[in-house]
Amino acid sequence: MESIVDLPAQTDRTANDHVSAITGGYVDPALTAIFDGLRETASEGPSPVWSVLNDSARLRAVYDTGLIQTGPHPEVDQVVGLTIEAVGIPYAALNMITDVEQVHAAIASRSGEIGEQRTYPLPDSLCVYAVVSGSPLIIDDIADHPVLRDHSAAQSGVVGAYIGIPISDDAGHAVGTLCAWDTQPHHWSSGEIQIMTDLADVVKNVIFDQ
């Protein structure tokens, strides 16, 4: 399996460093590589991004959760609902990333209104960035993000602020993210980031029966 480390290297950062780097005009080369890689075609040759996404062991871990095939899981739904209350944000989801699409395994909104669309192409996913990099993606204001301001979620106004914590099995294969977002900019505090990280651990334990 070709790793994301074959992309431009990311240094280790604390939660606050992530926020500072992403909102302060810093252009993360790994994010740029993923953004470009998701738009490459097969004719352009093998890409480290697609090597991660297409890895057979990672895909086996995705499907072994059963969330792609069977849909809603009561305990996962409960954690995702709790995420909205704990972080105080309008939307939260557990999104699984296959080799072709993002799938809502669970989604909740503060208003109770949820769209019918359950799957999205990977170029339209934000969660795929956390899965490929293996690191949280934290965005205070996507309109000011040096890379992702051109993302479809930003252009459509669906996402103003976003946080996605990757969820991996014990072998380190990232299968998806626990994420939360707002249509407006939002500063993610260190406390909120820690809450999301803790809840992602809960989801991991549920879906991998730990």
Give residue ranges: language-model regions.
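A generic "structured core" feature
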Residues: 126, 169, 193, 197-198, ...
